[in-house]
């Protein structure tokens, strides 16, 4: 397998391509990317005939920023006969490793979403054909991915179950709670799902912890913390949701988020302030260097150009400055589904 299919946010194809090219080279694997603006996917073609398979095994999916989901294969299948798409796709599947499951996908564009009904309808007969030809093995570490780009073109490939997103297309199925003050609440929930293993939630998001939410109004992120019974200082000059204030867990502080500092250390810092990445990075460094918190989730609003480079610059600076203070830190970034022109960072120190 020499081709990697990479789902990404529409408009971030160049960042996705730059990232996979750099990370692949670090693994000694070289190739080139095929991109199209706003297509919501990138295809990375390796020089080595097994380069994509090696990459998807060795490169930690968790380390990828702009890639929502990925799988390795041999390339696209075009001119699929409308009357029998199963036969050519079955032939392609038989050249791949046996898989434990089948996932049907589109790309995250309006054109892609229009194919959702086709994908859903096709999965049943295709799944039966795979089963009949012994292409499925419930114990296999691989998952089979099928992406339709049109009614006659598709990509087919495999991804390691333990080194890929658990969600089709890398898009979590989260529902907006009726009582949440804003849609931004889903961003923090998705961040927790991505950065913190489910088995660690009770320990790292424990009831009774204390958090500071910078730029909190009207309270989307604070709402998530309150649902975990975490005490929150909500810092914002704007108004907060009344029900949150009545919960007994929230203290609203009228202040500038960049100037506020807690009187005592807290467990969590969360920040969704719209500002330059360098300024947000400085604030995060200040909080950790002064011992104000041990964990943080924050957003970096990206510039129009050199967005991947900007994230890498912020990463290098944060880790470098904390490292110079003798602090051992873990820092990950991800462009979440609920992010827009931004990435979300998770930082903790040990």
Curated annotation (Swiss-Prot):
Organism superkingdom: Bacteria
Q: Which Gene3D superfamilies match?
A: 3.30.2300.20, 3.30.70.2810, Vaccinia Virus protein VP39 (3.40.50.150)
Extract the SUPFAM superfamilies matched here.
Answer: S-adenosyl-L-methionine-dependent methyltransferases (SSF53335)
> Which InterPro entries does the annotation name?
RlmM_FDX, RlmM_THUMP-like, RNA_MeTrfase_FtsJ_dom, rRNA_MeTrfase_M, SAM-dependent_MTases_sf
Per UniProt, the enzyme's principal EC class comes to transferase
Q: Which GO terms describe its biological process?
A: methylation; rRNA processing
Family to which the UniProt record says this protein belongs? Belongs to the class I-like SAM-binding methyltransferase superfamily. RNA methyltransferase RlmE family. RlmM subfamily.
Q: How does it assemble?
A: Monomer.
Its protein name is Ribosomal RNA large subunit methyltransferase M
Source organism per UniProt: Cellvibrio japonicus (strain Ueda107) (Pseudomonas fluorescens subsp. cellulosa)
Q: What is the lineage of its organism?
A: Bacteria, Pseudomonadati, Pseudomonadota, Gammaproteobacteria, Cellvibrionales
- Coding gene? rlmM
